[in-house]
Amino acid sequence: LFDAAELAAKYLPAHGHGDALSFEWSVFGQRVVINPGVFEYDAGKFRDLSRSTKSHNTVTLDNYDQSEFWKSFRVGKRANIINCNNIIKNDSFTVTASHNGYTRLSKNPIHSRKISMYPDKIKIEDSIEKGNGQNAVARIMLSPDISVEMNDRNCFLLGKGFKILVESDNKISLKEAWCFLDFGHR
């Protein structure tokens, strides 16, 4: 599942989240990469966290959200998808998309993501065009049912009946995060 759609309906952005170019992934019916869900609709830290870009499987620049979230149900400047393309071949599928949510930052950075799927691997490539050297952080939220083994550059995701190698050109770190699989439960 890949989110390359508008933030929300233009007339009702209240339920929009900072999830442009985010993805979810299941293996053999088991959720691996998840959307962490929503805890509450009332104003507060968990509402803000649920909507934030850092709580989704995408990239933050200098820890900014892709869109400007105000209070519990308002949105200011919004990230918009500015292109989305896909290529289907016999044994692979590739989707590429970009958004303009960070153009309010210095030198108008554009985040692009390319996800390529093959029979034996998935490759995710993020790039930042323009910009002013902002610190880019890609986050991936794992299901609580997934175990992790890791070293500096690689990690293994362990589920029921599978073990997946994750490789990166950058350092991988593991941090705990909030997950709201059911509304109102943490």
State what each model feature region is.
Residues 1-34, 88-89:
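Carbohydrate-active enzyme catalytic cores, enriched for enzymes
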Residues 38-186:
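CBM-like, beta-strand-rich accessory domains located in the C-terminal region of large
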